[in-house]
């Protein structure tokens, strides 16, 4: 018994002395890592988010912001997306011998990548995207980081040739180098990159190498081509049968889709934008791509009809085909896409009536079928209103649709944007019998139609969402719904406007009677266009419209003086009161002093600057006649206010969340690819454009 105790005591001592160096080494390692981070923190100009980085807390690095530790307590990951400012020059990479992941995306780091980054021998993941790094990628990054698998450098100012980069990254599984200043063509080396799963390159020259077909493990491919020559999609692309995400853009792409793409049966997202591709979308493509959740083929030259097999894509959430030359009827089978929430068929050559099945898309949030040759009417019988309970944006402008104002839409409680412009709608707008008619509407454009009669006060009083000038309570699904304004020859992108932008455009109709006084209650209104109607009476009081930026009342039958209260509208940047019957002196205060002569011409009894007609004792000048010819010329030169509701952005629809943006969806961006990569590898990535 005594002997056993002695043996046990002896073994415990051996274990203690054996483990002591390891424990001391762990403590020392934590202190070294912590001190290195604190030293680097002091060189950053904005580090309020890093208050937890303190020398008195090096034994608990897990509590530090952006730090992940392994089981021994040593730092294994650094994840910082905090808009930090500074460089990497003072970061002692050699202190982090166990670091496997370095994610510094979405900051404001600048300068070169230090060659000492090669000291991170165990690094498998490096993300420096969306910063301001410059220069060439250091040679040591390629030669010394033998365990590196994923490299993301998107959105910087790196230089150099793709040849020198890709030939040294053959062991990687993921490479994303989009939005930089790299030059040269893609080298024909894909045969030596058998493990590649993710490839994202933009702004390269030359063609897509046929050797891309050797990337049998490739799952995500995003390529943008900028070349003076024209190239076709290589048929070898069809050999990449594991592709789930394919994005191709660039005006150098020509020809048609190769039939070999029918082999890409795992595709969930296909985006082909801003190219010169032509031909038809054949039925065999649709029947092969039954896993699609997002199909975005926009701004190309595709022709022909949409195959009826489109109804087989039951997983589809996003269908964007705008900016092509598709023709024929809109297939009624689209009504079978019960998961569809984004539909954009605008700017094509579709004809015939709108299929009634389209109103049965129960999940649709954004619907844009504008700028086609659609005819017929839309009426309550077109579908079950409850099916459209989620609809927020509807644009059927620039077609040939007729009938009365679609008051059946007033029950759509989530409707925010309604564009009916440039059709043949007619008749009067009656007083609504619904208590909350269009209560959430923020943008309405019914210009260039044939509406007549007196505009009811109650019609405008229903626009409750426009009433509050400080209303920022907008859901994310609408916050990025954007439009392009064409205003007097100038294009404005609503990305530069406030997110709670509101607009009423009733111009170029045949409304008559007084302008409803209820217009003065819409305090949150930014744009009011009533031009080219037959409104009579005085200009109503608009002094409460303190957010108003654009007011167009030209070419009506308005009388009386210009209300002095208009001088209180300090946000007003556009005004047109021309070709009415206004009289008296133009108020010489505030914003009214900034507008040109063209804002007031065609009112013979107006006087004062900027007109040449003097007031009071001044010498009168010849008055301009209000001729029909002059009025028509003015209408042609001043096109008024037009809307084109378009797609922006946001991941691939419900693949990535709520609606982030109408414009983002219409125009393909490499960020779609990056966002998808981030989703797969669980990277927190907030968008930042440069």
Residue ranges: model-predicted function:
Residues 1-690:
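Plant-biased, solvent-exposed loop and capping regions
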């Amino acid at each position: 018994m005594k002997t056993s105790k002695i043996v046990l005591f002896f073994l415990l001592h051996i274990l203690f002395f054996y483990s002591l160096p390891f424990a001391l080494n762990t403590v020392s390692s934590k202190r070294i890592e912590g001190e290195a981070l604190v030293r680097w923190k002091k060189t950053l100009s904005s580090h309020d988010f890093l208050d937890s980085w303190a020398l008195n807390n090096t034994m608990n690095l897990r509590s530090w912001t952006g730090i992940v530790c392994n089981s021994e307590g040593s730092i294994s990951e650094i994840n910082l997306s905090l808009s930090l400012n500074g460089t990497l020059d003072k970061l002692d990479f050699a202190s982090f011998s166990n670091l496997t992941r370095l994610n510094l995306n979405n900051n404001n780091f600048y300068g070169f990548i230090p060659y000492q980054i090669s000291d991170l021998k165990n690094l498998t993941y490096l993300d420096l995207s969306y910063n301001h790094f410059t220069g060439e990628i250091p040679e040591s990054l390629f030669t010394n980081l033998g365990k590196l698998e994923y490299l993301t450098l998107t959105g910087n100012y790196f230089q150099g040739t793709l040849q020198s980069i890709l030939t040294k990254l053959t062991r990687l599984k993921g490479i994303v180098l989009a939005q930089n200043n790299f030059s040269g063509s893609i080298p024909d080396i894909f045969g030596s990159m058998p493990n590649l799963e993710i490839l994202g390159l933009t702004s390269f020259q030359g063609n897509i190498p046929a050797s891309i077909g050797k990337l049998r493990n490739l799952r995500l491919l995003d390529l943008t081509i900028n070349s003076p020559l024209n190239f076709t999609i290589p048929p070898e692309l069809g050999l990449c049968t594991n592709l789930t995400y394919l994005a191709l853009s660039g005006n150098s792409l020509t020809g048609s889709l190769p039939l070999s793409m029918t082999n890409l049966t795992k595709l969930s997202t296909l985006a082909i934008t801003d190219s010169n591709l032509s031909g038809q979308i054949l039925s065999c493509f649709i029947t092969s791509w039954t896993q699609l959740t997002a199909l975005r083929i926009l701004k190309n030259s595709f022709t022909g009809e949409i195959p009826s097999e489109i109804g087989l894509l039951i997983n589809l959430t996003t269908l964007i085909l705008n900016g092509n030359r598709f023709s024929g009827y809109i297939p009624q089978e689209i009504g079978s896409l019960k998961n569809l929430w984004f539909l954009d068929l605008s700017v094509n050559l579709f004809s015939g009536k709108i299929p009634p099945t389209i109103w049965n898309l129960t999940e649709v949030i954004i619907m844009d079928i504008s700028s086609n040759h659609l005819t017929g009417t839309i009426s309550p019988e077109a579908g079950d209103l409850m099916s459209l309970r989620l609809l927020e944006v509807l644009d059927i402008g620039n077609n040939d649709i007729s009938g009365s104002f679609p008051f059946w839409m007033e029950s759509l409680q989530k409707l925010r944007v309604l564009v009916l412009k440039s059709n043949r709608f007619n008749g009067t707008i009656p007083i609504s019998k619904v208590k909350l008619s269009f209560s959430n509407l923020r943008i309405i454009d019914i210009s260039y139609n044939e509406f007549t009669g007196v505009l009811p006060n109650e019609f405008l009083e229903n626009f409750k969402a426009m009433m509050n000038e400080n209303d920022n309570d907008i859901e994310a699904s609408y916050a990025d719904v954007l439009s392009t304004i064409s205003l007097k020859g100038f294009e404005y992108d609503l990305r530069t406007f406030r997110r709670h932008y509101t607009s009423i455009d009733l111009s170029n109709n045949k409304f008559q009677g007084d302008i409803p006084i209820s217009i003065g209650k819409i305090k949150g209104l930014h744009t009011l266009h009533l031009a080219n109607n037959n409104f009579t009476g005085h200009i109503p009081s608009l002094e409460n419209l303190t957010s108003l930026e654009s007011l167009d009342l030209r070419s009506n039958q308005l009388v009386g003086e210009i209300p002095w209260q208009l001088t209180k509208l300090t946000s007003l940047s556009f005004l047109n009161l021309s070709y009415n019957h206004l009289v008296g002196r133009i108020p010489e205060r505030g914003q009214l002093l900034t507008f040109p002569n063209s804002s007031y011409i065609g009112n013979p009894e107006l006087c004062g600057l900027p007109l040449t007609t003097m007031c009071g004792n001044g010498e009168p000048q010849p008055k301009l006649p209000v001729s029909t010819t002059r009025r028509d010329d003015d209408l042609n030169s001043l096109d008024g206010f037009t809307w084109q509701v378009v797609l922006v952005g946001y991941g691939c629809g419900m693949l990535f969340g709520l609606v982030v943006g109408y414009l983002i969806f219409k125009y393909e961006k490499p960020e779609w690819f990056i966002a998808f990569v981030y989703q797969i590898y669980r990277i927190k990535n907030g968008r930042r454009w440069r």
